[in-house]
Amino acid sequence: GMWSMTCTPSRHGTLLEGIRAAAGDKAEILYAKGSNIYYDAETEKAATGIRPLERGDNRKLLDEALRVASRSDVIVAALGECAEMSGESASRTSLEIPDAQQDLLKALVKTGKPVVLLLFTGRPLVLNWEDTNVHSILNVWFGGSETGDAVADVLFGKVTPSGKLTT
């Protein structure tokens, strides 16, 4: 989340690390980046306020994602916005998932494998196509330093995202 910048990075894991820890030796977890946020590097820089550190060729990223997907039983796609794309002075002309990510998601759905969409965002997004074509959607917002473990707990059934506050 936006305030994660004040944490000690070495004490907090990524989504991939959380999923791998939750799976342990019971499942092989495969990973591919899949896409950049946007096709165009300058658009991505303007939208995020930062120059992407690990930007790759979108076609190569998509091809790699499809190779990994072909070896998978279930596809977990972590898509959406980065924290700089939400909030004050972060207007967008579209409230859909950015185009490069939409194309990735559509290609993953075409594989015929079950697709779980993890949606990272700080605002509501228009998900008409996703709602019709993706097996499940979990809006994880910008959860902060424990997001990886928390999302993995939901994916592996350790907790149910019921939205109920305990007393």
Model-derived segments and their meaning:
Residues 1-167:
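C-terminal non-catalytic regions of proteins with extracellular/luminal or membrane-system context
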